[in-house]
Curated annotation (Swiss-Prot):
Its EC number is 6.5.1.2. The lineage of its organism: Bacteria, Bacillati, Bacillota, Bacilli, Lactobacillales. This is DNA ligase. Residues 577-652 form the BRCT domain. It holds the Pfam family DNA_ligase_aden. PANTHER family: CHROMOSOME TRANSMISSION FIDELITY FACTOR 18, DNA LIGASE. Keywords: DNA damage, DNA repair, DNA replication, Ligase, Magnesium, Manganese, Metal-binding, NAD, Zinc. Belongs to the NAD-dependent DNA ligase family. LigA subfamily. It comes from Streptococcus equi subsp. zooepidemicus (strain MGCS10565). The keyword Manganese applies.
Length: 652
């Protein structure tokens, strides 16, 4: 067996050389995989004979079985979008009114996939996708096959690095030519190709497809004093950093840079879809903070989207989970931004009236934010005798009278028994960010509703195997899996349930903030809007919406029924202890700690109720300083901020 292991190792390494370096494989993938699996089985049986150069011990030789979920220690926020000079000016005015000394760093917005790289003692431990910003997927083995990502840093740092993985235009062209030759469907664009590559289970394919990265953020280290310095430090650590950026305090300069980049973007070897403008000084970033969704110190200017002409054939009106009735145009198919588009949103009735959009019109279609197809304008020169579009007065689902509130642009169905509203609400409740009930998608929801088995979310927890087997197309194995997923959802932390209820203005992050503060859903029956508005990151509108919902008798009954069904109503995450010694204090870590690493120190401070930030400002209450503390310690002393050492922290 030892001889066979040596033979297989040599043979597979030869094939790896042909595949990766020479790009001229002499055997098929299936033949390689067959030999590889034989080697794996032998090594599992005779582990003492595993050779150091075995391809099973090398990055690039792994056949993965799937991807595990990964919870980010630090959330990855999205960015506020801007589509005009006016929106950039408004951003500038908001920043400069509070911080006249603010500078901006404008960076290219790479059209790729957000990734997070976690290093412990300088070793790459985790590579993950962004996901929903809180939970992504662990794609570490694939990340290790991206050549420009360091597997080991020159310093033994505990740090999280963020950036974009992308596919160059050249690599994209090559892969599509290969797929065409092999009779495989071509990728629509480099971003799709990069996304498909990162989700490959065969890491050899990832290695061959030549993904690359640009990194732009570090989290968990003693912060640099600016975003520009962060980029320089990342480059020093061996990461790929995009050199196309501009530092200026003038939004006029930033706008000129954006215009210049837009005019020459096709000359770049990779695709971009805009420019990100960030406040350069990290101390100002710290003071500006975040909304529930995005940092207040950054904005993403998106280049105007590609536009195409198409004819509106018909219009569908659909009811969403909040009762909003949305018009969608059915179009003659057009190729747009690498995909075939045959439907586009018309937004709402006010938009239709403003643009005077009619069935039969030739319209200009674009992808809003390069994602959602939308109708931009009518091509008046091609209009003949089209008549104004009839606007529905009755709900397309339940036929009840639609309303158009003065302060809203949309038509709304207010019938709580509307079939579409109920079904969309149930789909939302079961969605991944909410209760995450796998198998309870639109098709199954429609069957359950049509059979009279579900009318609200509590009915989900009354379903039996017999109920599900009554439905057309539902087999016993699928039914058992769905019931298991429903049972598993009962144990979710309560913020997922709160989000799943679909209360207006209450998103996933707001749900978490609310439950972190109040602990369980039943407590929300007695809170006031003013109390809720005091939570950092929320506001009075969210508070009023939540209170209005929980003042209804139906809400009390709903919680009682869910509780009776065994659904957890409590927040299971770590809550700030209001009695904790450091509750409510803003704390900065600086210098080298001897007994704790940076992550452990941060976790201990947070357990004691502190908010740990990266830079010293007037809002800082306390600085914990280790040895070799530098500018942060000096600034804290200058501002008269309380300073403690590591031993003090250990003794708490």
């Amino acid at each position: 067996m030892k001889k066979r292991i040596r033979e297989l190792t040599d043979l597979l390494n030869q094939y790896r050389q042909e595949y990766y370096t020479n790009d001229a494989p002499s055997v098929s993938d299936s033949e390689y995989d067959k030999l590889y699996r034989e080697l794996v089985e032998l090594e599992q049986t005779y582990p003492a004979y595993i050779l150091k150069d075995s391809p099973t011990q090398l990055v690039g030789g792994t056949i993965l079985t799937g991807f595990q979920k990964y919870q980010h220690q630090y959330p990855l926020f999205s960015l506020q979008d801007a589509f005009s000079r006016e929106e950039l000016n408004a951003f500038d005015q908001r920043i400069k009114s509070a911080f006249p000394e603010a500078e901006y760093l404008a960076e290219l917005k790479i059209d790729g996939l957000s990734i997070s790289l976690v290093y412990e003692a300088g070793i790459l431990k985790v590579g993950a996708t962004r996901g929903d910003g809180t939970i992504g997927e662990n794609i570490t083995e694939n990340i290790k096959n991206i050549k420009d990502i360091p597997k080991r840093l020159s310093q033994a740092l505990d740090v999280t690095i963020r950036g974009e993985a992308y596919m160059s235009r050249k690599a994209f062209k090559t892969i599509n030519e290969e797929r065409q030759e092999n009779g495989e469907p071509e990728f629509a664009n480099p971003r799709n190709a990069a996304a498909g590559t990162l989700r490959q289970l065969d890491t050899r394919i990832v290695a061959k497809r030549q993904l690359a990265t640009f990194l732009y953020q570090e989290v968990g280290l003693e912060a640099a004093d600016s975003q520009q310095r962060t980029l320089e430090r990342l480059a020093d650590l061996g990461f790929s950093v995009n050199s196309h950026y501009l530092l200026s305090s003038s939004m006029n300069d930033i706008w000129d840079f954006i215009q210049s980049i837009e005019a020459t973007r096709e000359e770049l070897p990779y695709e971009i879809d805009g420019v990100v403008v960030k406040v350069n000084q990290l101390a100002i970033q710290e003071e500006l903070g975040f909304t529930v969704k995005a940092p207040r110190w950054a904005i993403a200017y998106k280049f105007p989207a590609e536009e195409k002409e198409a004819e509106i054939v018909s219009v569908d009106w659909t009811v969403g989970r909040t009762g909003v009735v949305t018009p969608t145009a059915n179009l003659t198919p057009v190729q747009l931004a690498g995909t075939t588009v045959s439907r586009a949103t018309l937004h709402n009735v006010d938009y239709i009236a403003e643009k005077d959009i009619r069935i039969g019109d030739t319209v200009v279609v674009y992808k809003a934010g390069d994602i959602i197809p939308a109708v931009l304008r009518v091509v008046e020169a091609k209009r003949s005798n089209q008549t104004p579009m009839p606007i529905p007065t009755a709900c397309p689902s339940c036929q009840s009278q639609l309303v158009h509130f003065e302060d809203e642009v949309a038509l709304r169905c207010i019938n709580p028994l509307c079939p579409s509203l109920i079904q969309r609400s149930l789909e939302h409740f079961a969605s991944r960010q909410a209760m995450n009930i796998a198998g309870l998608g639109p098709a199954v929801v429609e069957k359950l509703y049509s059979a009279g088995l579900v009318h609200d979310v509590t009915d989900i927890y009354r379903l039996s195997l017999e109920d599900l087997l009554m439905l057309d197309g539902i087999k016993e194995k699928s039914a058992e899996k769905l019931l298991a997923a429903i049972e598993q959802s009962k144990a979710n932390s309560a913020e997922k349930l709160l989000f799943g209820l679909g209360i207006r203005h209450i998103g996933a992050k707001a749900s978490r903030l609310i439950l972190e503060t109040y602990g369980d859903l039943e407590t929300l029956l007695s809170v006031t809007a003013e109390e809720l508005a005091q939570i950092d990151g929320l506001g009075l509108v969210i508070g009023q919406s939540l209170v209005q919902y929980f003042q209804q008798d139906q809400a009390t009954q709903l919680l009682a029924e869910l509780k009776s069904a065994g659904v957890n109503l409590a927040y299971l995450g770590q809550r700030p202890d209001r009695q904790a010694e450091l509750f409510g204090l803003t704390v900065v870590l600086t210098g080298k700690l001897e007994k704790l690493n940076r992550t452990q120190a941060k976790e201990k401070l947070e357990q004691l109720g502190a908010k740990v930030t990266g830079s010293v400002s007037k809002k800082t209450d306390l600085v914990v300083a280790g040895s070799e503390a530098g500018s942060k310690l000096a600034k804290a002393q200058q501002l008269g901020i309380r300073i403690e050492d590591e031993d003090w922290l250990l003794n708490l």
